[in-house]
């Protein structure tokens, strides 16, 4: 509720009644009728902006007009009238209040002195009926400053500098019905200050500095219907009956204060109250009988407080309640029978609340409920009889599908197929490759296996999207809490971490061999196997630790439909947040920095050697080829990881990140490395291209011989892959053959780099 909305309180003339035509059509659970025809449509087709019924019935009454907001349109014009430059509309333009200050405007019996730098209440004819003194410099209201205005009905004193009001300031205003004191500096109201305002219906004192009130403060307000004290600094309400001198009070707005609790006696005399707004306070405790006297209450707003526990029967006397807001409270648990007595409830807001024990039983008694609001759209499946449930999506999934976007539903299969095919192809072709360095081949196969897991992960997500197609919301919560989701999420993290660590290992091997060619020792079989095993063990530990302690990590992988824990700081435990940051901004960021630094150093080393080794004439061309290859390796790593680092960092800063980001990252960004690694590290290397050319040449030769009837003996399909250290003949590595050591270094570097170009 904003400060401007206070003017909507004109609607407080009586309690509204919502009339709805009876429906003879009976629909099954989760389906709702199309007006007066026999057709029924599922919940997800109602209020979706499309005329699915054919008679617009599914798009009617979609707005949440429960509570007093039902009267919004009726009094919308009045709101603008009261907040416009000329708030009055007298029947005659002629001024009937005698002489007025030069800067003021007058029409009929209404006086407008807004923004005229007045420092005191002007003296005009006593027959004035409305007076607006907004945006002036009035600091005090002395005794009897309005005593002559017996006919005054509306008094506007907003946006002045009023700090004190005399107990006799409003004496004589026997006809006043509306008093606005908003946006001033009032710190205290003396008991009896409103004693003469027997006809006052609206009292608006929002955005002041009031720190305490008591029942005597409102003595004399026998006709008051609306009391607005929002955005003050009240820390507590009196332990005595607050409405003792306001028997007709219908609307009490205390939003935006610092109230810590509500006591049983406070509201005991407010039996006519129909709207109670207590949002944005610091209420942390409620007694079971707090609202017992409010049997006519129609709307209750307790949103954005610090309530942790709700007594089971706290709402048992609120049988007329139609709108309840409990949003953004740290409520630990909602009882299964919490709402059983709210038989007329039509709108329930539970946004921002993690309902760990959610079940259909909670909402089944609410047969008149038409609107419900949750923190997670998956919760909507537990209220299938409610026509409108929000949110409809978390940006990743929708009520209908695990993957909300058609683009995502298509490309999850395309990306997974490309990823799996590329990596499986490289793995399967290894038996046909005679490699002098089995250890390098072993590392590449290990990398392909890790990347292939990412393709499998995407296949599984696509498969469950197909399984739940059209009715995902029925299965959403169970899916995210299921073992399948936990395992598939672990698979994605396993693939990611093993791939990152393997790329770092391969990069460091290249870095040492190229930058320090004479110190490079051929990696032994035992060392390589040990490193690979340690990398996989580390990946398994990182991926599966969150499954070992549910209390510490909560539902780590089940924060969204794709089971990937990229950013979910709003639902994670502190331990899970630290763990997630350690993975994405710890291990992965460090690995990315190492890779970028290593490739930069490798290229710089080759370039520096070429400056002094004039014997190598084609070095510039080789450098360009090398630079291009290194650029694409670093570029794909950056393309994959920089967006993830940015998203994770922004989530730590509490920046709101659209849910769609996660699905796009998981389907299009995260698999980039997994899909391109086979291309960058195998399919575009010189040995592979030479093997393809050789195979094609042999195929053409064999075909030519066959056409001539000659017998051919083509070499088998074998790719001879050379480890960089083995490509130079031993006799060429003798130092005596080179004038300068750097020449030998360059030859060695050039030879090593041939396998990467």
Curated annotation (Swiss-Prot):
Binding site for Ca(2+): 45, 48, 50, 52, 58-59
Annotated localization: Cell membrane
Disulphide bridges, residue numbers: 27-40, 34-53, 47-62, 485-563
One record GO biological process: hormone-mediated signaling pathway
Pfam families, per database record: 7tm_1, Ldl_recept_a, LRR_8
Topological region Extracellular: 1-408, 465-486, 549-577, 651-660
InterPro entries associated with the record: GPCR_Rhodpsn, GPCR_Rhodpsn_7TM, LDL_receptor-like_sf, LDLR_class-A_CS, LDrepeatLR_classA_rpt, Leu-rich_rpt, Leu-rich_rpt_typical-subtyp, LRR_dom_sf
Topology, Cytoplasmic side: 430-443, 508-527, 599-629, 682-757
Predominant location category: membrane
Annotated ranges, domain LDL-receptor class A: 26-63
GO molecular function terms listed in the Swiss-Prot or TrEMBL record: G protein-coupled peptide receptor activity; metal ion binding
Function: Receptor for relaxins. The activity of this receptor is mediated by G proteins leading to stimulation of adenylate cyclase and an increase of cAMP. Binding of the ligand may also activate a tyrosine kinase pathway that inhibits the activity of a phosphodiesterase that degrades cAMP.
Protein name per the record: Relaxin receptor 1
The gene coding this protein: RXFP1
